[in-house]
Amino acid sequence: KIANSHATITITNHFRPDYSSCHVVDYDTITNKALKMDTHQGYSSTSAWARGQAWGLYGYTMMYRETQNEKYLQQAINIAKFILHHPNLPEDKIPYWDFDAPNIPDEPRDASAGAIIASALLELGQYVNDDKLSKEYQSVAAQQLRTLSSDEYLAAPQTNGGFILKHSVGNKPRNSEVDAPLTYADYYYVEALLRYKTVSYTHLRAHETVLDLV
């Protein structure tokens, strides 16, 4: 009940008409009224912080899995559309730390956001009834995993402090963990690899090179 309430209120108060989301919403503690949108780790209160968009996609996909409530599935589909069709999403599908960062393309990428998105898309692709959408999600996720598994992002053994992935961004406005490894980047990368390996995607197996790591 609490999770459903939180997810529904978040749709109302965190998301914009284009299905991007803000990082923080300030509430009146007496009336519970939403007072303003803000950010803590994003570029601005009106920007689309990349990992925040990834969390939203992952979260509403999970909410649909647990509840079978179609409104959560539709929310996940809408968030995926915002992410995948954003003009600032690079060709290799690993986002900049914020979709609205001011110096794109000279901004850090966030491998953690890419890993979260890939894992979410692989799950979401199983739930949608539209075969075209399912193929798009699965193909983008596979592309993200190939990118993250390249020398650009995948650390050599016994380097990178023992972490798997390079080039994540924790909190750029406060210059914390910028272009750094992050534990949760590794977690969602491994989760996405396992999902890619264990879920049967016929069109991917037929037309895409299967990742050597899986």
Over which residues does each language-model region extend?
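A beta-strand-loop signature enriched in Asp, Gly, Thr, and Trp
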Residues: K71-S134
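Carbohydrate-binding/catalytic loop surfaces
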Residues: D18-W49, D92-I116, P157-P181
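Well-ordered alpha-helical segments within folded domains of soluble proteins
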Residues: K1, A48-R65, E107-Q126, P181-K197
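Long, well-ordered core segments of solenoidal/helical folds
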Residues: I2-S20, T29-K36, Q75-D92, S139-Q158
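Conserved small/polar residues in nucleotide/adenosyl-binding loops
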Residues: T202-T209
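C-terminal hydrophobic structural anchor segments
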Residues: A115-I164
